[in-house]
Amino acid sequence: MAKKNYIIGIDAGTTGIRTFCFNDKGKVISSAYQEFKQYYPKPGWVEHDPEEIWVKTQKLITLAIKNGKLNPKDAVAIGITNQRETSVVWDKKTGKPVYNAIVWQCRRTSDICKDLKKQSLDSNFRNKTGLVLDAYFSGTKIQWILDNVKGARDRAERGDLLFGTIDTWLLYKLTGHKEHKTDHTNASRTLLFNIQTKEWDEELCKILRVPMSMLPKAFNSKNLFGFTSNVKSIPDGIPISSLVGDQQGALFGQLCTEPGEAKNTYGTGCFLLFNVGDEFRISNQGLITTLALGPEGKTVYCLEGSVFIGGAVVQFLRDNLEFFKYSKDSEKLVKSIKTKDDIVFVPAFAGLGAPHWDQEARGAIFGLSRDTTPAQITRAALKAIALQSYELANAMEKETGKPLKFLRVDGGATSNAWLMQFQADILGTKVIRPQNVDTTVLGAAYLAGLERGFFKSVAHLRKEETKTTQFTPKMKESERKEEIDKWNLAISRVKTET
């Protein structure tokens, strides 16, 4: 077998694991994918099995290498990107989780957040972390586990338990339980990390009653985090040289490393990130401030708008309502409709994220009649993805005072051309889709490769960028306004907070 160096990229998403092998031009050699089980113990609760995630990650690394007919010994490095906020607590000695991973979409800690708001602690968290008090973030999830798993709090206070987001969990397992680390982008999503000092904050940990001994050491995303040890089918000693939250990974994967550059990712949720460089700023438009990556992987700030249910609404129609067998069939179904209707679908299954931040809002469909079809409901669901993203872009324009000249997009749902055209129409601006829409893991691979010298520089990577598909607005302004007005009315009807 001829020597062919490559980077392994692991994308530990919300619904499944993808693994990729990338060549020295940042192009995909091979990949593998598998979904994992979603657990819904109570309404609004979402969990994953951390052990299942680990087992499937090992299997898929092996499969991606096999699919590319590559030699495991030729892997130069591993980069990991992950669903952020999802929280795992495990035993330091055994490496066994004390409870399932509590997923970012889970709303079980809404009451904890409400109590903190009643104590007027919002600004304590906002000014240090850039975040709002919401069940979305990790801090209250950790508190819930410690308070609700028998003996967990005592064990944590004795220093016997560790916390990590999924990047930390996979790093810990890949290194044979040797490394307990995270990166700044994941740490910045916990409600416990001061994004100005880039350190865990003692005051916030005390408020949420999280022992600091549980927390991983935090580093820049481009960093030598450790080496593989005792992993099935791959050799010991492969460097793990990047960890990055999925949305910041996508921002870097799109090479939006300069202030003013933005991207929107359409995955389980939708996430619009706008690079603001070295400027720490608190939004007054319902956006959050978080950490991202600038030139050559330097930590910078960005504004983010987060939508909890994006592509997941298509999964809901597929799995729960059984409108179609495969997600890709949604586009064909919508294109079959020849008439207009007034159906509006607000997929607030996990509350509303930015810019509303309403934890108690729930999903609703308006405008149903006896002759409503699955195709019409599907169209309304796809429109909802674009309209929620419009709200993020609108908030971003108001916050920065700059019009959006174009929007770079990525993520699985961008393969739906009907959705992308409607997005361009509703934004009134050009939408640019790259050839490789898996830019979350591409960002992790870029960072891992830059750290090891496998890639020369960001400037070099820009030269390797491939062709794009562009969608330009075609909708009449009157029709666009009508769609937005219907959406705003529907949102006002599901909101519980003013």
Curated annotation (Swiss-Prot):
It comes from the Bacteria. ATP binds at T14, T15, T268, G311, Q315, G412. Sn-glycerol 3-phosphate binds at T14, R84, E85, Y136, D246. Transmembrane segments: none annotated. ADP binds at T14, R18, T268, G311, G412, N416. One of its GO terms (molecular function) is glycerol kinase activity. Pathway: Polyol metabolism; glycerol degradation via glycerol kinase pathway; sn-glycerol 3-phosphate from glycerol: step 1/1. Belongs to the FGGY kinase family. HAMAP family: Glycerol_kin. Key enzyme in the regulation of glycerol uptake and metabolism. Catalyzes the phosphorylation of glycerol to yield sn-glycerol 3-phosphate. This is Glycerol kinase. It comes from Leptospira biflexa serovar Patoc (strain Patoc 1 / ATCC 23582 / Paris).
